[in-house]
Amino acid sequence: MTLYLSGLISYLAEKNLLVRSKHCEDAATIALYGIDHDSRIIEPGHVFVCKGAAFKSEFLKSALETGAVAYLCAESHAAELEAIAPTVPALIATDANLRRAMAEASAYVTGHPDHNLTMIGITGTKGKSTTACMLRAILDGDEPYEKTAIMGSIEVFDGIEHGKPDNTTPEAPELWRHLANAQKCGLTYMAMEVSSQALKYD
C-alpha cells in the first residue's frame, strides 16, 4: 500500500508532534517510500530528517538533489531551511520533539512492521550481545537465519542486510528499515540489544 505525505502529516499532528507544516498543498499526491537522516543515502520518495549538532543546511540541498520529497526539521532551523528550499514541503516540530517525531515518522513510513513481529529487547550493563545471540540460536533451532532477525553491537541481520553495525541501537530510520526488511522476508522474531543510552531518549 502506497503511503502519502498527507497521511504522515495527519499522523504526526494527532500525536501533537508538529508545530506546523508548510508548502504541503499537494501532500495528498506525494508518495512516500522511506525516511532517512543521512543525506548520503536518501532515495527518491524519501523524507529527509534535518537533525544533529553537526547538521548543515547543505545536507538538505544534497537530499533534495537525490530525490527527497519533504523534510522534517526542528523549529529553530525552519526559517533557515525554508530560505534554501522555499517550495519544498516542510514538517516542523519543536526542538524537544524532533527525535520523537523522527521515530514516529519512521514507524509510519515503514508501515509499522513491529505489529507483525515478536519484538524482544535486551538491555543491561553486560551480556546483551551474548544473550541476543543465544536467544536467536534457540528460536531458530536447526534452521539458522530462518526465523529470527537480530540487531546488536556484533551483528545485524534482517533477511536483506547482514553485517556489523555502527551502533548498538541504530537511529530510528535505520531501526525501522531493519524491522521492515525482517517483515518482508517473513521472519518471525526480532531480537535486539537496547543500550541504556537509547532508553534515556524515551
Where are these regions (language model features)?
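Phosphate-binding loop of NTP-binding sites
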Residues: 99-202
